[in-house]
Regions:
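Divalent metal-coordination and catalytic microenvironments
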Residues: 5, 24, 36, 45, ...
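Active-site environment of divalent metal-dependent phosphoester hydrolases
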Residues: 14, 64-67, 97, 119, ...
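Metal-dependent catalytic neighborhoods of phosphoester/phosphodiester hydrolases
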Residues: 69-77, 100, 217-225
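Catalytic core of the metallo-beta-lactamase
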Residues: 103, 113-169
Length: 244
């Protein structure tokens, strides 16, 4: 059974009109993983899956545009979906911030497993491996394997992190491209050109850009990334489904 990636939200840092922040649904057979849980992604998740069928949750880091729906998700899972003990993987800092935001314990719903650089774990059919990126808080990119298929997600990173830390043989790379070219190096994020170059160096077969700022010029980003990648590049949009 192949892997599908559904974009639940892809706006960088904040959601634009009608948009949602970072979140993705990874599915294969009866395995369904909610990867990053930014504001707006729980609503979009319900367009594609009954939330009771979630196999696990993975959160890349503690910036709220990547986990902001977890506190409201707690109420939904605990009181309406009757779903408890969901295997949840994230950094220790993310868990602490979630507990503060929710105002109390969360482990009855989110069975938390702390992950860090080099962590490996399985959720259903998926095998995950983590690598810490170039970002102000501990941020984990993930490599996801199912059979011979490989998906990789950078989460947030600057150019000081080598994508090759996730290994080679990446069939589909979902790579952040937050900034326009004239802001390269201003903060720990990538431009589209930097994303394209990193994907080429890592030998990725397919590149999808995500985490662009609301209002960003998508065609310019696509063109700049493709020039460095050496092949066509796609731009993530909410509710886009990508099949491997």
């Amino acid at each position: 059974m192949g892997l599908s990636v559904t974009v639940l939200g892809c706006d960088g840092s904040y959601a634009g009109p009608g948009g949602a922040c970072s979140g993705y649904l990874l599915s294969s057979g009866d395995t369904h993983v909610w990867l990053d849980c930014g504001p707006g992604t729980l609503a979009n998740l319900q367009q594609h899956l009954d939330p009771r069928e979630i196999s696990g949750i993975v959160v890349s880091h503690s910036h709220p545009d990547h986990w902001g729906d977890l506190p409201v998700g707690y109420a939904a899972f605990a009181y309406y979906f009757d779903r408890h003990s969901i295997a949840t993987y994230g950094t220790s800092d993310t868990r602490e911030r979630l507990i503060t935001a929710k105002g109390g314990a969360v482990d009855d719903v989110y069975d938390w497993h702390t992950i860090t650089d080099g962590s490996e774990f399985d959720i259903g059919a998926f095998h995950f491996r983590c690598a810490v990126t170039d970002h102000p808080v501990e941020t984990l990119a993930v490599r996801v394997e199912i059979g011979s298929q490989v998906f990789a997600y950078t989460s947030d990173t600057g150019s000081a992190w080598p994508l090759t830390a996730l290994g080679t043989g990446i069939d589909l790379l979902l790579c952040e491209a937050t900034f326009p070219e004239d802001q390269a190096g201003e903060f720990a994020h990538l431009t589209a050109s930097e994303a394209g170059a990193a994907a080429r160096t890592a030998g990725a077969k397919r590149l999808v850009l995500t985490h662009l700022l609301p209002g960003a010029d998508h065609e310019a980003a696509r063109t700049n990334a493709a020039a460095m990648f050496g092949a066509d590049v796609e731009i993530a949009t909410t509710n886009l489904r990508i099949d491997l």
